Amino acid sequence: MKAFGTYFQNDARRPLRYGPVELINPPRQRLRGEPLRKGILAEPVIVGFCGTDHELMEMGRRGELAPKFPAGQNRLINGHEGVVWVPEQNRFAIVLIRGGDSIDPTRFTEDETYFEYGCDQADGLFCDRIYVNPDMLLSIPDGYAQDGKLALSFAKKMVFPDPFACMLFQLERMEDLGSAHWFRQTARRRHCDLETARKYAAGEIFERTVIFGLGTTGMFVGDLIRQAHPEANILFVGRSPVDSFKVRFAVEQAKANYLQNIFDSPAACSEAICAALGGKATCFIGVSGTGLEHRIALEYGALGCNGIYNSFSLGPRISFDTMPFGFHNHLIFGSINFRQDHMEKAIQLLSRSRYDEIVSLIDKDEFTADPMSAYENRIYCKGAPMKTAVIWNGDYIDSTR
């Protein structure tokens, strides 16, 4: 079956194209131990653009995409954020992106297989029709679909379950690792037993939290930390002006403080962070995508003794001096993934959120006429909206709600 969509290929001049593609439907499994199942047809309704899409385009430009293509193919239909209509089931759904022969995709091991719709070995959502394993079609809450149409305000929020689920996993990991890192000291300080100390420590790690970078991932993790730990002192650090909509929205959602990084040196920025927090950070989360974040945290001392450094940025290389690192008892980790329960919780939380306010729409005809130009001049350029999405099939959208 042929359908029209955007796809990546290894091509220095045109790594991203829009046109007819032959759909494939290999059997896939959601988790290890479950049966391999052929996909059922789904029709994308609204699809969001993610930084991963831009990175895949650049990989195609460099000729590095072959491992990402579905088996036997020389292209990858991209797109992994959004809502689909499932004709066979007469319902809207969110695609669970990650699956494979793995007992837990958040901690997959070298002897397990792994795929991602729209990103890695499986075709994605920027297409008129796609095949999806029926075990990987997640339900949406009641009340948002009426007469076969989805409320636009809700649809906009549903381009975020993937990154929001990633941040739910980040919160879980920071609580787990932070608790393990701190609980013995906490037990001594609070004069309590070790199990009680673990519970205290899971919150204490966020006592002075830095979120370095203010994209949607930084905004989401700040919001989630605040919901889970109302007592946390959260500081966003970014380059946007204090009075910009993005900053005002993020600060309001997370009930956080903000520091504009206009400093001449990393040392000055580190000093300002500590002053704003009232001490060195207990938790430093890097989401800026730059190599500056780890230098400010580790080299210039914004991260305090016994602190944790969570690298969620893709691209930067992290280095540190092993002598102070060991004596300061720092914990550095990175983890990018999520489980189905994270995504299901993300759908529920997002449905009650205001995150539709940060989504801008690009006209489908404009996008498909020249997708590379849209990427470079509308979606991933200086001054671009925080989040861009495209209504792929307007027949399923009620723009009055």
Task: Locate predicted features.
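C-terminal hydrophobic helical "lid"/dimerization subdomain
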Residues: 38, 178, 267-272, 279, ...
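Hydrophobic/small residue at the entry helix of a nucleotide-binding pocket
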Residues: 217, 242
